[in-house]
């Protein structure tokens, strides 16, 4: 699917390549000198035009000239037929700026009308299979703010990639094996006996959250004291299965209420049951990347970019978590994913080079794995930090957050900053119904537009109020043109956000778009604007509503008709 603005950019790129070829003698470039990768971007400063390129700066070394000289030579060789380019100038150290004929804006609104809910889609992925794994919280407690941010990020990344043509699978890795699960069983055992009236302390390194008290109470209601005597392993196994089923069901329900639905819930234990961990260790051994020391089995991680070698099997014969994680990633590749994306917390930063090294050791392409590292969340209420502590049960859960601020505010606030930035979440702001609350501000723009069309129907007319393409050349006001220009940016914003795995770009874009609409709405009438102009403005606000809704959908936020 090609868009007007993207077509103009592509045309300018082709023209620049043609200019380099034509100017080779003047630039002193022989035929073997490749044209370096360059950009044609929308400049930040409005007075710099509609597009700018850095091509001249990149040719400085091979051409042995100043970038400004190169830029002037390139401009003299530019051929821009039928590209609606009004002016080309050289600015600063050697940027080439392009100003388009203002009439190009006339094609934007009909384009949005044509594509509707599909406006912004691209086929950049070509159907390539992508797996996005996110949250993957231990089933040992409730979902906290870090999990919530990961859920919002991961789901929006998946939505963006799907929107631009990738075949996306959302996956949750269930940590139902290993030490933390053993701790859960022992913690449940303590809560079970406490529910039966016995004095049985929770292990010091166990899980002290009050949620396990409730889980144990429900277990007693169902099974009574049946497991109080007898084989401890049988008792712990029954308690563990009950807790895991309940915890996973609760997680699934919470995430679904947050607007997140997974295609696959993948069990860590299944890697052992199917022998995948053993197969992975055997393959690493066969390829010569394992060795024994002090009774343990080690991976030569240092040979693959790691800062030290890693234990994969302890001296007691039990595989480490890293061993299972390598097997899990091997399984991802073996399932045919072309691109694997993980959303991990900041505490996993050092795990990235180790995992990439392990994949390389197995013979897989480590560059097919991308990891989005997510920084911490701080909650604020009344200007004070709301403290969180998972092990003591005093942290704020995702369920509590949803009850307090609602899904839309939570989803939007969690993607307002890049994953690599710390996030301060102001609970009071998220609940407010003022323009300072960005979610309210954006949704109010959509509701305002919907109100216009309700008024139209109340006057006996059928929405959207025009039966053919209105005369969009009547939209001459600066507020109108600024709004159309920003609407035209949406496909490129989506493509860049998908490429960067950066949903915050869409959060910023849709807030900016809402601001431009409010400015237009406060300055100009729509209904009753006069013959021809009313229809053109109805088309403008209808297209704005389409793009607001498309952008909010990518973020998992609703677009209300009324507020």
Curated annotation (Swiss-Prot):
Cytoplasm keyword on record: yes
Compartments it resides in: Cytoplasm
Family statement drawn from the similarity comment of this UniProt entry: Belongs to the class-I aminoacyl-tRNA synthetase family.
Subunit annotation: Monomer.
NCBIfam families: argS
HAMAP family named among the record's database cross-references: Arg_tRNA_synth
Protein name: Arginine--tRNA ligase
Organism listed in the record: Desulforudis audaxviator (strain MP104C)
Taxonomy of the source species: Bacteria, Bacillati, Bacillota, Clostridia, Thermoanaerobacterales
Originating gene: argS
